[in-house]
Amino acid sequence: MLQIGPYTFQSRLLLGTGKYPNIDIQKEAVEASGAEILTFAVRRMNIFAPDQPNFLEKIDVTKYKLLPNTAGAKTAEEAVRIARLAKASGLCDMVKVEVIGCDQTLLPDPVETLKATEMLLEEGFIVLPYTSDDVVLAKRLQQLGCHAIMPGASPIGSGQGIINPLNIQFIIEQATVPVIIDAGIGGPADAALAMELGADGVLLNTAVASAKDPVKMAKAMKLAIEAGRLGYEAGRIPKKKYATASSPSEGMSIV
C-alpha cells in the first residue's frame, strides 16, 4: 500500500487528467488505470464554475483523492496562491508543488520549490513537491517535512524514461517519505523500471493521454507498475560478467 500523510492507497499509480482526446476517453482511462489519486492543473480548470464542463462532472469524486498541482507558477508566492485556491474549493487538502524554472525544459526551480514547500507546510497542506533528480535537493525537501517527493525521470512530456537511474536510486535509498517518479515516463517498461528501482509510485499523464489508445495504455501502465513492484519485492538477481549454469552438473554421466 502507498501511504501519503494520513492517507492510504491500494494503487501506486497516480494519473494526470490533461491532454486526453475527450472527457469520455479520459473517464475510461481513469477507470482502466485503477488509480486512486488524480492530479489536475488548477489554472486549467475553473473549479468554481459549475456551468463549465470538466472531468469532475464525469467521475464519482468520492472514489478518488484529488491532487491539484500548481503548474504555471514561476515563483513560490504564485504556487502558494494557486494551492490556496484549490483548497478553498473544498475538494483537496493535498497539493503537488510545481514551480517551473525553465520554459524550454520545464525543469523545476529548486530555490522556489523549497520556498513554496516550506510556506505550504506552515499552512497545513499535505505537500508533494515535483523536483529534479537532484539527490541533495530531495533531502532538503524531506528535512522541511514534505509528505512525499516527486523526482522527474526526464523532462515533462518527453517520454525519455528514466535518464539517470543512479540518482533515482540514491534518492530512494535515503528517502524517509514515499518517492513517486513523476515526468518523462513514455511506456510501460519505464514505469516498471521505476518500481523495480524501489519507487513507491509513479505519476503519469502524457504517456497515457497521448497514446494511440489511452484506455489500453492506462491498463498497461497499471499492470507494469504492479509487476515492477512485485519484482522489487521479490529481489532481482545480481548482474554478473560471466554465465552461471541453471542446471546442476553433479551426477551427470559422461559418455
Swiss-Prot record:
Residue pairs linked by disulfide bridges in the UniProt entry: none
Any one Gene Ontology BP term: thiamine diphosphate biosynthetic process
Gene3D superfamilies reported for this sequence: Aldolase class I
Reaction catalyzed: [ThiS sulfur-carrier protein]-C-terminal-Gly-aminoethanethioate + 2-iminoacetate + 1-deoxy-D-xylulose 5-phosphate = [ThiS sulfur-carrier protein]-C-terminal Gly-Gly + 2-[(2R,5Z)-2-carboxy-4-methylthiazol-5(2H)-ylidene]ethyl phosphate + 2 H2O + H(+)
InterPro entries: Aldolase_TIM, Thiazole_synthase_ThiG, ThiG
A cellular component term, taken from the record's GO annotations: cytoplasm
Record family assignment: Belongs to the ThiG family.
Record protein name field: Thiazole synthase
UniProt organism field: Anoxybacillus flavithermus (strain DSM 21510 / WK1)
Gene, per the UniProt record: thiG
